């Protein structure tokens, strides 16, 4: 029987047979051994990748082996079809310790779905999740449900037909006679004609691709309701053949008003059929992993929400700014790309860089801030300083956690580098509350308005 579990990033997974501590996250021996096989498959199939970047095998004293989920959010399917859903470790507020585990996962899932909607290349921005029972569905099943929601809307509106070219050996004359093939096949069959002809039917590339996606999702989904809905939707595609060549059919997709209703679902189909955003594995194994780059997700979410609260200002907000280079000679080298640059009417600038990392309240350990990140902020400050002007304010934005929540009030962590030219470098930290993102961005806006200089 295939298993499905839901955990949060940085969780250690133990084999249930090896531990007695109920406070640990445990799975069956079958699933644990399958996860070990997954790690082996990944390292064998991806010679340029290291599975330890997102999962690793370790041992805890007096307990035994564990598999650690590192900085990784998404879905894993193991060689035997088990699924592990990994959600981001999001601080849900002061009451998180009082909340039950199910409620914690439900809230985290809702926040995560809001976050990934802001990604440019993920085709889910306009899909409605209000009717989905997300508290009962693993994250991957939610994506499948969203696809099925779009497919059902399309099917009920009516699938589009189109003229399709066919070749067949017929008993009647229809279309154009293919002379050479007719001679080759019908020397002994004078009653037949090998014809090329057009027919107006549903078997167009767009419908073939959707049917192929539905069939693939049927094999992947472990949810009874999703399976039921797939079977229902497939009844609309009875006269449609599955695609035998995905790339060819996508190249034949029409780009006109007649298929406007297909745009969103075909983007989804491409993700599932080509495993876009998936890390796939070769060989006999059926392993795959859907991995979300949380640095990118966090940056995208913060940028969108900051734009919303700053819409009443005259500020210009640029994401992934590409204006400056670290070296000007020869011919501009090493482009700088701060996550967010704010330019005010008076010419002053603010640099914001997002980091998906959980800091600790330990000044002696620099709060866990990476030294390379600080070098990067120093370079931003120097290169974005206006000629004859002041250095820009530089902010590092981290997700808040229970340890650093006290810094969401008026307390600021600040680093200052004194310079002879009096253009000191100021780097300040801000902790983003993902549960209360609107309020958090309002607080950030107030701090940016005050300049803190």
What is the role of each PLM region?
Residues 1-46, 286-453:
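Catalytic core segments in nucleotide and nucleic-acid processing enzymes
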Residues 2-282, 287-288:
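Residue(s) in the substrate-gating loop at a strand-loop-helix junction
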């Amino acid at each position: 029987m295939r298993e499905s579990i839901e955990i949060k990033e940085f969780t250690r997974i133990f084999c249930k047979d090896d531990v007695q501590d109920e406070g640990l996250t445990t799975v069956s021996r079958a699933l644990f051994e399958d996860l070990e096989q997954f790690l082996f498959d990944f390292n064998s199939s991806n010679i340029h990748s290291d599975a330890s970047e997102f999962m690793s095998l370790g041992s805890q004293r007096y307990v035994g082996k564990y598999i650690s989920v590192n900085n990784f959010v998404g879905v894993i399917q193991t060689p035997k079809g088990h699924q592990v859903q990994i959600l981001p470790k999001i601080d849900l507020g002061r009451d998180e310790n009082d909340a039950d585990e199910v409620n914690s996962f439900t809230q985290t899932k809702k926040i995560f779905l809001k976050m990934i909607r802001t990604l440019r290349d993920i085709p889910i921005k306009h899909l409605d999740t209000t009717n989905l029972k997300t508290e009962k569905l693993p994250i991957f099943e939610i994506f499948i449900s969203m696809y099925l929601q779009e497919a059902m809307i399309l099917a009920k509106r009516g699938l589009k037909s189109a003229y399709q070219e066919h070749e067949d050996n017929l008993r009647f004359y229809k279309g154009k006679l293919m002379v050479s093939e007719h001679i080759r096949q019908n020397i002994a069959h004078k009653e037949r004609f090998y014809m090329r002809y057009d027919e107006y039917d549903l078997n167009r590339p767009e419908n073939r691709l959707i049917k192929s996606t539905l069939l693939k999702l049927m094999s992947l989904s472990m949810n009874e309701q999703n399976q039921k809905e797939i079977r229902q939707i497939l009844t609309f595609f009875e006269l449609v053949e599955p695609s035998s060549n995905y790339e060819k059919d996508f190249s034949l997709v029409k780009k006109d008003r007649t298929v406007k209703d297909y745009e969103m679902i075909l983007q989804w189909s491409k993700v599932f059929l080509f495993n876009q955003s998936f890390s796939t594995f070769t060989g006999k194994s059926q392993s795959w992993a859907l991995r979300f780059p949380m640095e990118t997700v966090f940056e995208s979410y913060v940028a969108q929400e900051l734009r919303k609260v700053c819409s009443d200002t005259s500020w210009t907000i640029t994401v992934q700014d590409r204006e400056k280079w670290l070296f000007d000679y020869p011919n501009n080298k090493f482009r700088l790309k701060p996550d967010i640059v704010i330019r005010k009417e008076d010419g002053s600038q603010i640099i914001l860089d997002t980091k998906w990392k959980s800091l600790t309240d330990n000044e002696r350990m620099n709060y866990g801030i990476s030294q390379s990140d600080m070098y990067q902020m120093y370079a931003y400050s120097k290169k974005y300083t206006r000629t004859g002007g002041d250095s820009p304010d530089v902010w590092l934005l981290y997700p808040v956690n229970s340890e650093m929540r006290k810094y969401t009030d008026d307390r600021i962590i600040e680093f200052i580098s004194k310079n002879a030219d009096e253009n000191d470098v100021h780097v300040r930290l801000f902790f983003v509350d993902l549960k209360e993102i609107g309020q958090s961005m309002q607080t950030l806006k107030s701090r940016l308005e005050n300049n803190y200089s």
